[in-house]
Amino acid sequence: MNSNLKLNEDETFEKVSELKIGNYVDCVFNKCDLNNFNLANFSFSQCEFIDCNLSNCDLKNTKLAEVSFESCKIMGVEFGVMNQFLIKLSFKECNLSFSSFYQMKLKKTWYMKCELEQVDFTETILSES
């Protein structure tokens, strides 16, 4: 967690289309449209994204620790540029088409009933996924 950023804890965000840079802990994002949004340097810990559009988001140096995505559209996202320290993700019924997980270590990552058309898993470690 970046101590210089605002802490947002135990909050629910409904149908938002932008977020302020910060640390988000135990938050729920429901039906948010963050298509093409710059999430660089954000931090999300123990958060849930439900029915959100995160397509083409910039995740440069973004932290995702124990984050779940359900029924989300996450197309064309470059996950490999994230901060990969303590990364733990799960995806259920998401569209991840045209995204890239190039050279990531994604042990025990769940991809349940997801659309994965032309996803780049080159040199990705997916053991126990």
What would you call each of these model-derived segments?
Residues M1-S129:
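Tandem repeat scaffolds
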